[in-house]
Amino acid sequence: DNDYKEYAMYTIENRAIPCYLDGLKNVGRKILYVMLNDFKNKKSKVAEIGGSLSSKNYHHGESSAMGAVITLAADYNNNVPLLTQHGAFGTRLIPEAAAPRYIFASLNEKFYDYFQDFDVLEYDKDPDNGPEPLTYLPNIPWVLVNGIKGIAVGFACNYLPHSPKDIAKLCLKYTNKENIDNDILVPEFPEFSGKIITEEHNKFKTQGIINRISRNTWEISEVPVGYTREKYFEILTKLMKYSINILHFPKLNN
């Protein structure tokens, strides 16, 4: 029915699927607006930033807002975080952040290197939709920098993160009318030190790092992208239980 259709389109356009122009969901745009106008040169508590979003027509709860602030600021989640983290925001292996009242965020000092042309931004004329612009204008395809994920009714997206330097080089080649058809943009994952293997059809595989310490001891110092420490412990536990000769593994490092 029409109500369901309207809800589906609202979810797609305003919540779940990021905009390809700036790589941001609506809440990310609201956070940047708040940081640029209310906390421009200020390190502020994540709880305070999340709370201020409610005055900018964000209607999905402070907990959701604070989670979005952490996502934009966490180093392990971004090649170029739009916010700078101050405090325990988690790591790739242990992604849990400290309580929002104990951690702080500020606008990344590199923000203006990538986002410009603020004088030509367009704004929604509907006062119920908030004061933030319809989209920000990055000078490289930001949708490729930090990667984006989103799932909604009938739609989904999943872009891998890449090095901004690699993206800029390809953009320059393209604007100089050079052929880039055979250039492969290899992903770059924050806080990942393992291997990225290029396969056919623009597919990629990540590989962790394991080293032999002694005859019966191996050290895993990196796990593939997409695994937290707990997920990898579950795999080792199953291997130890069913077939592989794993006698013991300590839960030591992050």
Each language-model region and where it sits:
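Charged, surface-exposed alpha-helical interface/stalk elements
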Residues: 177-188, 197-254
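Catalytic phosphate-handling regions of large nucleic-acid enzymes and associated NTPases
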Residues: 1-203
